[in-house]
Amino acid sequence: MITTEKKKKNKFLPDFEKQSIYSLRYDEMQEWLVEHGQQKFRAKQIFEWLYQKRVDSIDDMTNLSKDLRQVLKDNFAMTTLTTVVKQESKDGTIKFLFELQDGYTIETVLMRHDYGNSVCVTTQVGCRIGCTFCASTLGGLKRNLEAGEIVSQVLTVQKALDATDERVSQIVIMGIGEPFENYDEMMDFLRIVNDDNSLNIGARHITVSTSGIIPRIYDFAEEDIQINFAVSLHAAKDEIRSKLMPINRAYHVDKLMEAIKYYQEKTNRRVTFEYGLFGGVNDQLEHARDLAHLIKDLNCHVNLIPVNHVPERNYVKTPKDDIFKFEKELKRLGINATIRREQGSDIDAACGQLRAKERQVETR
């Protein structure tokens, strides 16, 4: 729930007149109902309308009294996302550009796999981490998203899938923004979509990725939720990583590894390292050996990413043969590694690219 105290802690949260009803966890909805003279069991009815029947209006919650519906309308907004652009790839990937109620835009991606449908969600409008290969950072950070705005991304995609009787089975928090810079809202989002009264998406079917905000890695290690954890690494040496990811100047690789080791000691869970391959920068066999040496004592997996070209950035794709050689070298050194399947290569698939293109149109 967005309280005054939470807004003070998170200065980048929006100051809307009404909170999104989707921002409330199940326990918070129960608490709110009791505080307003209602019975606790109404929370189950409300969540069923929101997440199973997926109604668009509080007035559609017909088994609630008119008085309760009015109280809900007086206090909460039904967050709606307006689809500005929808791009569909020949491989079935769909990229949405959504407009928020204050006019800002965000991206959400639906990816189709043999094992189900995965949604990549955004946690911030823009990003201030400044990764030099990423379109998300163009224009900087505008604000954080409420938990309800993150939930609404999944719900909006799920409503689109309802027409073909499909469901969202996996969530990856790898869209625009640094999730650990919007930590409390991200955690509320995770608990909402994981709740069996809500979308009931299993914790092990959800992955959160960070650029390496070390204090929050320690916090995340203490959370009682079995979410998959990924770290955008991209280089094993500080010199290269600092050029790719300026955040590394604050959180050096050795300190990042200490935090990850702590996370594994606390959770006994595997970590995925995301490693984007940039031609002539971090894609040589010596870089593979540096990486293997850095992570050899960790329970981990390396996800090698053939990067999407971003016109505003100067990096180039590593040739396919070199990608395979890099993977082979890691495996030779005992590291579990795979090459991520490229999806959406014929649309604006790079993170933040579609939003950046729309911003260019707006400013012409």
Curated annotation (Swiss-Prot):
Organism listed in the record: Staphylococcus haemolyticus (strain JCSC1435)
Q: How is the cofactor bound?
A: Binds 1 [4Fe-4S] cluster. The cluster is coordinated with 3 cysteines and an exchangeable S-adenosyl-L-methionine.
Q: What is this protein called?
A: Probable dual-specificity RNA methyltransferase RlmN
Q: What would be the name of the gene that encodes this protein?
A: rlmN
The listed locations are: Cytoplasm
Any Gene Ontology CC annotation: cytoplasm
Give a GO biological-process term: tRNA methylation
Cofactor(s) named in the record: [4Fe-4S] cluster
Active site annotated at which positions?
E107 (proton acceptor), C351 (s-methylcysteine intermediate)
